[in-house]
Structures are given as structure tokens and as C-alpha cells.
Amino acid sequence: MRTLVTLACSECKRRNYTTTKNKRTTPEKLSFKKYCRFCHAHTEHKETK
């Protein structure tokens, strides 16, 4: 079953994106380089609760 997760910017800690993931196949936390509109730059976004 896919669950909804939130991605937070590693620089400003704001939660900018949501996505879904299958916790059975990917138990580790997700990490993407995405654009943060508050930092005005591409930063690493990590999975949060």
C-alpha cells in the first residue's frame, strides 16, 4: 500500500512537496534535489513525517 509522505527542504526546513511511496519496497527515507520557492534555489528535499 502506498502512503503519502512530505518532502522538506534541507536548507530552510519548509515542507514544499508531497509524494507517495511504497514502504514495503523502499523502507529508507526518500531524498530528491528539487526547487525550493522560499530559498529560490535547487536544494535537497528529504522525507519527513
UniProtKB/Swiss-Prot annotation:
Cysteine pairs bridged by disulfides in the record: none
Domain of life assignment:
Bacteria
Q: Does the keyword Ribosomal protein apply?
A: yes
Instruction: Extract the Pfam families matched here.
Output: Ribosomal_L33
What are the protein's UniProt keywords? Ribonucleoprotein, Ribosomal protein
Q: Which GO terms describe its cellular component?
A: cytoplasm; ribonucleoprotein complex; ribosome
Extract the signal peptide range.
Answer: none
Tell me, which GO biological process terms does this entry list? translation
| Gene Ontology molecular functions | structural constituent of ribosome
Which family does the record assign?
Belongs to the bacterial ribosomal protein bL33 family.
Identification of the protein by name: Large ribosomal subunit protein bL33
Query: What organism is this sequence from?
Result: Syntrophobacter fumaroxidans (strain DSM 10017 / MPOB)
